[in-house]
Amino acid sequence: MTELQQIIEAAFERRDSITPGSVDAATKAAILQAIDLLDSGKARVAEKIAGEWVVHQWLKKAVLLYFRINDNGIIKGDDAQYYDKVPLKFSDYSAEQFKAAGVRVVPPATARKGSFIAPNTVLMPSYVNIGAFVDEGTMVDTWATVGSCAQIGKNVHLSGGVGIGGVLEPLQANPTIIEDNCFIGARSEVVEGVIVEEGSVISMGVFIGQSTRIYDRETGEIHYGRVPAGSVVVSGSLPSKCGKYSLYAAVIVKKVDAKTRAKVGINALLRSIDE
């Protein structure tokens, strides 16, 4: 455990006594350092190590402590004023800083301090919360929301109105993760620490939480909390045990590899789900 982590862990144990006026200098400096590490992408709440996702809970604790040490303050916008504890990521950026970051931010897209936006990323009018990590080549489309501490991989497309859940409380919960090369269709919601594995395609209007049954029609297997790599998923339903009604489910209609996905294209994959 690093010294920074030790300070954060100790501060979190006494979090109820920490206020903007009472926080000691060493604790405040540690919290700000942790937020800067998240903001720069040098640290992230979750990362894949040896093929498994590892969650760094102490960084989530640092985010929660950040709220404890900040007073609300005015945040200026072009046409309005806002009042919050967390400043905006790009509020003081110059044209040179935007060029160096390699990101496009379309008004009125909002990213909070403590989120990381990698190069070659496009933020249409959307929202990225504190602690989130958005990797290279990703498109966050109009009115999409990337929740606190969510992890978005490389070359992901979050379509219009998509919601990726944030998980700061309960603290033991894992962040929602969208792995590399995934497509999330318009108005879909992925929440509660669900992992959408690499190369998956989620159709429009699919809702997936930890309790959602994810049914593979080819094998009959039911998954919870995880969409297997290369899955093409649509909204559907499964019959109840008594056969009197059906309940919502996400249905894996096919599996595709990277070569097929690149050759065929997203629309063709979704149009041919009855094949």
UniProtKB/Swiss-Prot annotation:
GO terms for biological process: diaminopimelate biosynthetic process; lysine biosynthetic process via diaminopimelate. One of its GO terms (molecular function) is 2,3,4,5-tetrahydropyridine-2,6-dicarboxylate N-succinyltransferase activity. It comes from the Bacteria. It is found in: Cytoplasm. Homotrimer. This is 2,3,4,5-tetrahydropyridine-2,6-dicarboxylate N-succinyltransferase. One of its GO terms (cellular component) is cytoplasm. Coiled coil: none annotated. Its main location: cytoplasm. Gene3D superfamilies: Hexapeptide repeat proteins, Tetrahydrodipicolinate-N-succinyltransferase, N-terminal domain. It comes from Aeromonas hydrophila subsp. hydrophila (strain ATCC 7966 / DSM 30187 / BCRC 13018 / CCUG 14551 / JCM 1027 / KCTC 2358 / NCIMB 9240 / NCTC 8049). Belongs to the transferase hexapeptide repeat family. It catalyses: (S)-2,3,4,5-tetrahydrodipicolinate + succinyl-CoA + H2O = (S)-2-succinylamino-6-oxoheptanedioate + CoA. InterPro entries: DapD_Trfase_Hexpep_rpt_fam (IPR005664), Hexapep (IPR001451), Hexapep_transf_CS (IPR018357), THP_succinylTrfase_dom1 (IPR023180), THP_succinylTrfase_N_sf (IPR037133), Trimer_LpxA-like_sf (IPR011004). PANTHER family: 2,3,4,5-TETRAHYDROPYRIDINE-2,6-DICARBOXYLATE N-SUCCINYLTRANSFERASE, MOLYBDENUM COFACTOR GUANYLYLTRANSFERASE. Substrate binds at R104, D141. Its EC number is 2.3.1.117. Keywords: Acyltransferase, Amino-acid biosynthesis, Cytoplasm, Diaminopimelate biosynthesis, Lysine biosynthesis, Repeat, Transferase. Pathway: Amino-acid biosynthesis; L-lysine biosynthesis via DAP pathway; LL-2,6-diaminopimelate from (S)-tetrahydrodipicolinate (succinylase route): step 1/3. It is an enzyme of class 2 (transferase).
